[in-house]
């Protein structure tokens, strides 16, 4: 099937997920034709590579050797850099964000927030910081780039530059989820052994503006549990709130 056809990526992604179903989230990640194999040590990695290559051969799928990289200690994948210590924002993506000039239209705001938002899990309270700009995305909002918008814009760029390295979660260890809520939005962080796995945040929905504080705190906890359910299901965790 030609990659020029509209449905080809979705079809191929579905096929690859079926081929590697038994290995997904155990030692392999797949995005269309990119296959990432990860392991704890070299012996384990050797076995994982054998299983993956045998599975490809079994389904008559062949990898081009010149486009393969093996035994890497650090790898760029979907805008991130993954290595032994954790996961970081790809520096090349950070450079493109820092060079962004102040938006002059709603479309440019949407483009910037789309790019910055892809890395929102690295930024504490992303939604609160972005709020002055997201207000301009409302249907009847008049575009006016204020000092508050400029401060929001510059703060997000700065946060991406200094974004922390997030640890890779260990499903054998306990999770700790910390939640925060205010009239400015909901925020949460999930951690293991005092180190950040991911941040999450969102702005309040119109009806939530009338919530009592205790209900906002509950909404923050619900948002966190939904966001990270793939980490928390079948695992022990504790939730903390102010």
Model-based region annotation:
Residues 242:
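Short loop/turn segments at strand-loop or loop-helix junctions that form parts
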Residues 1-239:
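Retroelement reverse transcriptase polymerase core
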């Amino acid at each position: 099937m030609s990659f020029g056809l509209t449905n080809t990526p979705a079809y191929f992604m579905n096929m690859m997920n079926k081929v590697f179903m038994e290995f997904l989230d155990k030692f392999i990640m797949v995005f269309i034709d990119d296959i990432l194999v990860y392991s704890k040590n070299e012996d384990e990695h050797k076995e994982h590579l054998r299983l993956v290559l045998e599975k490809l051969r079994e389904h008559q799928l062949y990898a081009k050797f010149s486009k393969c990289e093996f035994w890497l200690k650090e790898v760029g994948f979907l805008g991130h850099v993954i290595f032994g210590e954790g996961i970081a924002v790809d520096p090349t993506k950070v450079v493109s964000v820092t060079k962004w000039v102040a938006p002059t239209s709603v479309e440019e705001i949407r483009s910037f927030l789309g790019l910055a938002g892809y890395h929102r899990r690295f930024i504490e309270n992303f939604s609160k910081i972005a709020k002055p700009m997201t207000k301009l995305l409302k249907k009847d909002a008049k575009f006016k780039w204020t000092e508050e918008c400029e401060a929001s814009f510059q703060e997000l760029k700065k946060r991406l530059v200094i974004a922390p390295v997030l640890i890779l979660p260990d499903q054998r260890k306990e999770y700790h989820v910390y939640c925060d809520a205010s009239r400015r939005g909901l925020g949460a962080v999930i951690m293991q052994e005092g180190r950040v796995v991911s941040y999450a945040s969102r702005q309040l929905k119109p009806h939530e503006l009338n919530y009592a504080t205790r209900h906002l705190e509950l909404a923050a906890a619900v948002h966190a549990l939904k966001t990270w359910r793939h980490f928390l299901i079948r695992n022990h965790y504790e939730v903390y709130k102010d």
